């Protein structure tokens, strides 16, 4: 039958969806629920729908109304699912007497299920009415509706059902309780029988044991009281020991932190000491270099002073000679006029001509000496310019060193402030951490103390309970023994056999049971207490041993800390001594810098005074030269002849050319060093004998740069190369040789300044320092010794010069 139904369901498409509980009629314009079941032969889709069709439909479009079939939740393919749809009343047809049916239509338009036909009819009052007898045993008939009758019946059945369910539950509980009571009674009966047999055998032994247990109980109570006192004492000792251990640990941690800080500070001080030593060596080297430069400047200034002194003496001498020559010229003019008037002898005239020629030659020699003096003066001005440039570089170097010193001091102060701030921060952080640790340890100790206190209270309660139980059992036992004695006396008079059996069954089991229970509980408690006391004694011994170990460790750490403190104090003393030495070095360096500044300022003022005096002497010489040019050579010769005849002051003229007393320090010649100013008179360019004319070209020799290294820093290879290289001729000397005329220096300074490198012209009143800075900007400067090199100097040679400072370990601080 089942196989036939399955085949029929598979073959019939209208049976894939089964509609449940379809009534014969429904009310129009009322809510309608449609219950249907999806069989495993259909796969639901979200576009499937259920429609109400008139019976006799032909296609799926002949529906009256429809609703979308919801997709079932948690649908498993191949399973049966129940679904419900609710049609609203205003979508349903009216009471038209037609038959309708539900149809399930898939999303493809296939009808896969149809219900039984039904109608939409309004309920008539006649059909709904029923007659029934009155429940009050009267002969009256009651007319009611079917719905009301059905509701009454349903209410009655539900009430009866509830009452029956309550009654069934009560009966089930009672039966279960009765069964449990029966089983319990049976078990108790069997247990009581066995217990009576055991207790009868154990009663005699327990009576004796009870006495011994009482004595033992008293002893154990004493022991327990002693043990509790010892436990309290041990707890107090443990708390004190833990506090001491915590204090020692905190002290040890603080000492370790201090030790680490001391080591860190020592390392920092060592690093600072090393850096300060390096700076000290640098300052020493720099001070040496500045002292060398200052000695050179002092020697140059001394030479300039000597030159100025000699030149001043020569200027005074020449002034005297010029005054004497002027007086001689005046006398000779007078004599010449008198001779012309008085004598006409030719011999006298020839003699006078000869004297006049000698006087002219002497005047020419004095003029040449004056020219060379002006040349030497110009050379001195050039030397002054060079010294001013060197002085400017020395000032710049001094300012740079001062700035570096101020920067280093500021950095040291900032570093010290940062170090102090870091120390305070770390100390504050460590103190906070120690406080938190101490709080945590105190909290743990308090918790441990609370636990121990609770445990002691619990043991005290157990002891009190045991003592109460012992007292109660003793009283019960005495009462039972008294009652048993009375029963035994009564049973002797009546029925000895029955009385003995009854007493054995009634009294002995109760007394023996109480005694055995109490004794077993007391034994167990005593064993537990002895175990706890032994454990606490072991803990106390362990804590004592740990405390001893901690004391030994603390002593060791204290000794190590004392040693480290001594070392730290020694390091602090060393650091303070080093700081004092550095402070002394800095003070000495500052004093030396102040002295050097004073010397430089004095030299600058002295050079300014020299330049002013030289300008005055040049202006005086110009005036005197102009006066001499205004007189005729005959008058000069007459004056010289008269002076020579009267005073005999004219020396005989030598045929040798005049020699400079102080050579030109900037002429092109081979010297030992470019800065020493040592010259040889045989190598100086001498002017020709002819009388110089003021119309000749004026040539000013430009001071040449010092291309040699400082003393002690020469490269032997470079010196050998320099010996083979030919010395370039001085352009000023070439100019003199090409003209073949005497050197003449125009003392007037109304000429434009010209840069010797880029040939840029500057006005006469242009600032000398700016002009020197412009000229120096073309030159290469050594970063170590501040030596200057021309712009066309070989780059490799310049690099070799810089490397020589490092090759000879000038800046080696080891």
From Swiss-Prot:
Zn finger spans (UBZ1-type): 752-778, 779-805
Molecular function GO terms recorded: kinase binding; signaling adaptor activity; ubiquitin binding; zinc ion binding
PTM info: Phosphorylated in the C-terminal region by CHUK/IKKA leading to NF-kappa-B signaling down-regulation.
Disruption phenotype: Mice genetically knocked out for TAX1BP1 show no obvious abnormalities at birth, but develop age-dependent inflammatory cardiac valvulitis, die prematurely, and are hypersensitive to low doses of TNF-alpha and IL-1beta. In addition, TAX1BP1 deletion impairs clearance of ubiquitinated protein aggregates.
Main location: cytoplasm
InterPro entries xref list: CALCOCO1-like, CALCOCO1/2_Zn_UBZ1, SKICH, UBA_autophagy_assoc_protein
UniProt GO cellular component terms: autophagosome; cytoplasmic vesicle; mitochondrion; phagophore assembly site
Protein name: Tax1-binding protein 1 homolog
Location of the region described as Disordered in the Swiss-Prot/TrEMBL record: 701-733
Source organism: Mus musculus
């Amino acid at each position: 039958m089942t196989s036939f139904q399955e085949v029929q369901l598979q073959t019939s498409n209208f049976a894939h969806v089964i509609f449940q509980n379809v009534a014969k009629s429904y009310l129009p314009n009322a809510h309608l629920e449609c219950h249907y079941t999806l069989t495993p032969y259909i796969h639901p889709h979200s576009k499937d729908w259920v429609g109400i069709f008139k019976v006799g439909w032909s296609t799926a479009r002949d529906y009256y109304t429809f609703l979308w079939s919801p997709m079932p939740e948690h649908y498993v393919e191949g399973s049966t699912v129940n679904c419900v749809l609710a049609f609203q009343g205003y979508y349903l047809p009216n009471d038209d007497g037609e038959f309708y049916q539900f149809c399930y239509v898939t999303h493809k338009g296939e009808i896969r299920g149809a219900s039984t036909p039904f109608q939409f009819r309004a309920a008539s009052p006649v059909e709904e009415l029923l007659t029934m007898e009155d429940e009050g045993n009267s002969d009256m008939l009651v007319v009611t509706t079917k719905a009301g009758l059905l509701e009454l019946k349903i209410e009655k059945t539900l009430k009866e059902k509830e009452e029956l369910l309550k009654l069934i539950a009560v009966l089930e509980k009672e039966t279960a309780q009765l069964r449990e009571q029966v089983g319990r009674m049976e078990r108790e009966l069997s247990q009581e029988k066995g217990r009576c047999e055991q207790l009868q055998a154990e009663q005699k032994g327990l009576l004796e044991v009870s006495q011994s247990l009482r004595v033992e109980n008293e002893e154990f109570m004493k022991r327990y009281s002693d043990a509790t006192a010892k436990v309290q004492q041990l707890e107090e000792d443990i708390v004190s020991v833990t506090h001491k251990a915590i204090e020692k640990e905190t002290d040890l941690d603080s000492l370790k932190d201090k030790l680490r800080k001391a080591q860190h500070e020592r390392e920092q001080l060592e690093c600072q000491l090393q850096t300060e030593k390096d700076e000290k060596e640098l300052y020493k080297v720099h001070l040496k270099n500045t002292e060398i430069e200052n000695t050179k400047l002092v020697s140059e200034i001394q030479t300039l002073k000597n030159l100025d002194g000699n030149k001043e003496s020569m200027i005074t001498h020449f002034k005297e000679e010029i005054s004497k020559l002027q007086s001689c010229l005046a006398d000779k003019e007078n004599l010449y006029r008198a001779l012309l008037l008085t004598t006409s002898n030719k011999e006298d005239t020839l003699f006078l001509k000869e004297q006049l020629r000698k006087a002219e030659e002497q005047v020419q020699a004095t003029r040449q000496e004056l020219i060379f003096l002006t040349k030497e003066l110009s050379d001195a001005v050039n030397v002054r310019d060079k010294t001013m440039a060197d002085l400017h570089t020395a000032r710049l170097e001094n300012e740079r060193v001062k700035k570096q010193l101020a920067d280093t001091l500021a950095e040291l102060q900032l570093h010290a402030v940062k170090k102090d701030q870091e120390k305070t921060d770390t100390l504050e952080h460590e103190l906070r951490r120690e406080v938190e640790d101490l709080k945590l340890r105190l909290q743990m100790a308090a918790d441990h103390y609370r636990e121990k206190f609770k445990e002691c209270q619990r043991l005290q309660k157990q002891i009190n309970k045991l003592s109460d139980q012992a007292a109660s059992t003793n009283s019960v036992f005495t009462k039972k023994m008294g009652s048993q004695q009375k029963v035994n006396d009564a049973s002797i008079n009546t029925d000895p056999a029955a009385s003995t059996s009854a007493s054995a069954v009634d009294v002995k089991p109760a007394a023996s049971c109480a005694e055995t229970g109490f004794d077993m509980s007391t034994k167990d408690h005593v064993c537990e207490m002895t175990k706890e006391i032994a454990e606490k004694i072991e803990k106390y011994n362990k804590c004592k041993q740990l405390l001893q170990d901690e004391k030994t460790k603390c002593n060791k750490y204290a000794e190590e800390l004392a040693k480290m403190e001594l070392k730290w104090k020694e390091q602090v003393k060393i650091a303070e001594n080093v700081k004092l030495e550095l402070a002394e070095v800095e003070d000495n360096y500052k004093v030396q810098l102040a002295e050097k500044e004073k010397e430089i300022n004095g030299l600058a003022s002295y050079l300014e005074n020299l330049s002013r005096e030289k300008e005055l002497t040049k202006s005086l010489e110009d005036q005197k030269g102009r006066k001499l040019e205004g007189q005729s050579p005959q008058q000069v010769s007459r004056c010289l002849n008269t002076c020579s005849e009267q005073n005999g002051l004219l020396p005989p003229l030598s045929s040798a050319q005049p020699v400079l007393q102080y050579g030109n320090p900037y002429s092109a010649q081979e010297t030992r060093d470019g800065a020493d100013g040592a010259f040889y008179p045989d190598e100086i360019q001498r002017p020709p004998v002819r009388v110089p004319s003021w119309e000749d070209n004026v040539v000013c020799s430009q001071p040449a740069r010092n291309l040699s290294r400082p003393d002690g820093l020469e490269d032997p290879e470079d010196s050998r190369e320099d010996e083979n290289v030919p010395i370039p001729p001085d352009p000023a000397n070439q100019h003199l040789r090409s003209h073949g005329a005497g050197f003449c220096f125009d003392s007037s300074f109304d000429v434009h300044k010209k840069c010797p490198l880029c040939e840029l012209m500057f006005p006469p009143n242009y600032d000398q320092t700016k002009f020197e800075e412009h000229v120096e900007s073309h030159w290469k400067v050594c970063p170590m010794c501040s030596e200057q090199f021309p712009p066309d100097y070989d780059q490799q040679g310049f690099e070799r010069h810089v490397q020589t400072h490092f090759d000879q370990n000038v800046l080696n601080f080891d």
